[in-house]
């Protein structure tokens, strides 16, 4: 899979202009999920494998502005044969036969995920306060004032990378994300986050088996930012799907 690399044209990236090739560079594998592990994913009929790829460079996307450009590939496991010994186009060669350059050297380092294994855990979370009826928001505000607890950190959106759940609207006000094909409101499919928790959510969402690790140590950093992705301003990118058909494309947010 390939996508045309977009040139950098924003202030702050001018030093990278010479690194971005005019010819295509390969899409990068970000994640893959099997229906046998996560049947909640709305796999199109006849598919049982979702592969998420993206171009590891900045693209001026309609939904988010500057971000990596994702591609969702729905496949059948039985169609996947032998694993390639060498990924296609590990090195980038220009159409005129120019010098080969490692693709990683032509990519935005914030969009190069560190390989890691998924350890699936199902949790229950509740909607962002903005998605709740007014009278419920009022009751929550009163509860927070009397208990000194935080609904957002203790009960609401689980931080970190996840499948499904609710979107957090802490950066922008909540807004609609209708399907571009049929107009149905889309729903969160996958969140890719810069970190798994933060100072506010640590007490609720930091895994118990990792709480002995001290802040600032390499061991702690590896659990806090296992993928090393940096999206937005240390934010998260969420891919939304149409509930009527996963083949209608996707919408994006960065929160």
Task: Annotate each predicted stretch with a short phrase.
Residues 1-255:
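Preference for intrinsically disordered or flexible, low-complexity segments
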């Amino acid at each position: 899979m390939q996508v045309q690399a977009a040139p950098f044209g924003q202030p702050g990236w001018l030093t990278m202009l010479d690194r971005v090739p005019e010819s295509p560079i390969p899409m990068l594998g970000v994640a893959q999920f099997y229906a046998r592990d996560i049947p909640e994913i709305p796999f199109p009929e006849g598919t049982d494998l979702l592969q998420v790829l993206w171009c590891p460079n900045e693209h001026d996307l309609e939904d988010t502005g500057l971000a990596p450009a994702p591609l969702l590939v729905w496949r059948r496991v039985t169609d996947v044969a032998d694993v390639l010994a060498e990924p296609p186009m590990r090195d980038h060669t220009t159409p005129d036969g120019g010098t080969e350059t490692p693709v990683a050297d032509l990519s935005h380092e914030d969009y190069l995920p560190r390989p890691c294994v998924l350890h699936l855990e199902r949790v229950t979370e509740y909607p962002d306060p903005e998605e709740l009826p007014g009278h419920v928001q009022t009751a929550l505000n009163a509860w927070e004032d009397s208990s000194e607890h935080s609904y957002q950190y203790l009960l609401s959106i689980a931080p970190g990378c996840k499948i499904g759940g609710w979107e957090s609207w802490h950066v922008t006000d909540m807004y609609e994300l209708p399907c571009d094909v049929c107009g149905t409101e889309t729903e969160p499919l996958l969140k890719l986050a810069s970190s798994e928790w933060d100072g506010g959510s640590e007490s609720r969402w930091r895994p118990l088996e990792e709480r002995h690790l001290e802040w600032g140590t390499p061991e702690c950093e590896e659990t806090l930012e296992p993928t090393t992705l940096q999206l937005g301003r240390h934010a998260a990118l969420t891919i939304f799907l149409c509930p009527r058909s996963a083949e209608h494309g996707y919408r994006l947010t960065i929160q």
